[in-house]
Amino acid sequence: MIDDILDKMTLEEQVSLLSGADFWTTVAIERLGVPKIKVTDGPNGARGGGSLVGGVKSACFPVAIALGATWDPELIERAGVALGGQAKSKGASVLLAPTVNIHRSGLNGRNFECYSEDPALTAACAVAYINGVQSQGVAATIKHFVANESEIERQTMSSDVDERTLREIYLPPFEEAVKKAGVKAVMSSYNKLNGTYTSENPWLLTKVLREEWGFDGVVMSDWFGSHSTAETINAGLDLEMPGPWRDRGEKLVAAVREGKVKAETVRASARRILLLLERVGAFEKAPDLAEHALDLPEDRALIRQLGAEGAVLLKNDGVLPLAKSSFDQIAVIGPNAASARVMGGGSARIAAHYTVSPLEGIRAALSNANSLRHAVGCNNNRLIDVFSGEMTVEYFKGRGFESRPVHVETVEKGEFFWFDLPSGDLDLADFSARMTATFVPQETGEHIFGMTNAGLARLFVDGELVVDGYDGWTKGENFFGTANSEQRRAVTLGAARRYRVVVEYEAPKASLDGINICALRFGVEKPLGDAGIAEAVETARKSDIVLLLVGREGEWDTEGLDLPDMRLPGRQEELIEAVAETNPNVVVVLQTGGPIEMPWLGKVRAVLQMWYPGQELGNALADVLFGDVEPAGRLPQTFPKALTDNSAITDDPSIYPGQDGHVRYAEGIFVGYRHHDTREIEPLFPFGFGLGYTRFTWGAPQLSGTEMGADGLTVTVDVTNIGDRAGSDVVQLYVHSPNARVERPFKELRAFAKLKLAPGATGTAVLKIAPRDLAYFDVEAGRFRADAGKYELIVAASAIDIRASVSIHLPVDHVMEP
């Protein structure tokens, strides 16, 4: 059928398929019965079409690092199944997920969106996720292909990575997704790879992806991430996104007629687009692109379970789990206590059905006999709190506000990211909008107004210009680097007074690749200052135990910018120190998208890492704190003692954050625990580490044989729960090559198994390895090579908690195709 359709197409029609129709849909060809399909952002939900802000509500799942922390592919596959259903509820046939870039520096703004520092764990998570999504008739899109481990100058930076490092660290998750999960789409990354944009890199998109791995699906660009006509399609990029076309269309037709692109190349890409439509069932039944909210009880329960399964208990001085009857006065303190920090920022952001804050979850778990106290202590937000409350938005044709508004609407939040406009009479390239709201302060004193805008804007309070985002506007880091840095100004306001807040916005005159990025965010907050910490200390003093909720939020952990350091932002470290000096019973609950330094670690009794676990945050946290379930997570990323213990953080800026348009992956294969192991650097908490509420004993590992053949072998380990509670343990299998001919890490994760055991129960971890698991990439031969000889199989509970090792022998060299 597909070839019949192609035979009837003109060149222009084939070319039309190779660019999006708009931001979220492909092109339809009605005369041939070719429907359009919709794609939607993930990975922790399905946002649907329209803006990155707002939209139809969706189930908000834990972010990828939280899924990686479960070490449970079966559970992740269940999440994928649910997310496939969420995508369909938004009329989408393609989910733009999962993200499988590697945790390299600890500072990547999208660290939260990726599973792990280890390629084997990342690959296992990705395969499970993809299998789940695609079981629902929705195509998964693995991204970002490849070496997109930083947000700094991401659209122009060249990631300079040697081939061995690519083959052993950064490519394996993509390879496994193709070979084991049959992923239907791949998204190229923004960056260059060794000087060539990934979207026009024939070695990457054709030689490796298609010829070596056998991928037959669609390769699409990241949004605005293609930069040429002939180069991209000749390299193997099928779909330019978003639409309408910028470098395809008439330009590609001309390139074919001028002999720069073969007609067969266009047909091959068009065929892959049609094949994608066939695979998602679009020819059988044209997709209904309508969007609706799908809020299922089973999704709620799964998200709650995932939150606990990914929670990592880093320290426990006998205080957890909390007995509800043991404490009369419980303090819940911190900037993340009453705020539900459920996800990261950027394109992964969705409108959740609902959110449960830690304070709400803890309060719901406690009986009325408990006295719960709350204090914020300090702020941790990167931007001023977004304006919340009813406001009128008037839209005008052109720049300026002298004509009558074309459209008027009411919204509840001072944040806008316009991909389209509410009236067909408006043009993104030439419109303006006026927002009018009333602000009533609760307290008298200094308030800070803040605003950031892609375009030009001014904020007035009672007619006075307070924030000027117009005169002197310069590009900064917000809204993916298209807006200015947040402009702030302090104003003294009186309690209970009504202030008229007006923001006037004009679309930018410049554009990005022919598309105007129009965005605005404004807010107001009263700074807490010393009084906030003093209130927290007094609250702690009056309480038996303190639950201290600290970390970051989705304006720190976000697409578009990297973190400045690995410390808790704002005055949170000061808050922890002050509270811990007042009350000896402090449990710190962390919410971050990656590792942080903990100079206060010795002063608190427990530390629980919750990540960003989705809409059920507060309930999942309460389940863990009060022992209804155990924290079952293990770290998917090493937590170093200091930022400089990361292999990518050196005195050489060319290694990170990059210099002169290049970032050198000079650490090579020594990423994460591979670096800590080999360089003998003690971590704060090792890869694979996590405490629980019960105890286990492990039996000696058993081998199916001592000689490795082509079919591999199996290691089994019996694990017994000797405690009085149900719990989980993760058996990790690492390979050590004592007689390696080339430099190799001390050990590398090759298999793992998570066992969930009742008290007194015994389970068996079954760990399978193959010759490829013993191999390194031989650059000269262009093959993976496992040299004959002795290998050690290390059975461990973390990268440093080694329980046993056994020796195997590889009788002959194994040379394997990549």
Swiss-Prot record:
It comes from the Bacteria. The keyword Hydrolase applies. Residues 386-538 form the PA14 domain. InterPro entries: Cellulose_deg_GH3 (IPR050288), Fn3-like (IPR026891), Glyco_hydro_3_AS (IPR019800), Glyco_hydro_3_C (IPR002772), Glyco_hydro_3_C_sf (IPR036881), Glyco_hydro_3_N (IPR001764), Glyco_hydro_3_N_sf (IPR036962), Glycoside_hydrolase_SF (IPR017853). GO terms for biological process: glucan catabolic process. It catalyses: Hydrolysis of terminal, non-reducing beta-D-glucosyl residues with release of beta-D-glucose. SUPFAM superfamilies: (Trans)glycosidases (SSF51445), Anthrax protective antigen (SSF56988), Beta-D-glucan exohydrolase, C-terminal domain (SSF52279). One of its GO terms (cellular component) is cytoplasm. It is found in: Cytoplasm. Pfam families: Fn3-like (PF14310), Glyco_hydro_3 (PF00933), Glyco_hydro_3_C (PF01915), PA14 (PF07691). One of its GO terms (molecular function) is beta-glucosidase activity. Its EC number is 3.2.1.21. The active site is at residue 222. SMART domains: Fn3_like, PA14. It is an enzyme of class 3 (hydrolase). Involved in modifying a vir-inducing plant signal molecule. Hydrolyzes coniferin but not cellobiose. Belongs to the glycosyl hydrolase 3 family. This is Beta-glucosidase. The lineage of its organism: Bacteria, Pseudomonadati, Pseudomonadota, Alphaproteobacteria, Hyphomicrobiales.
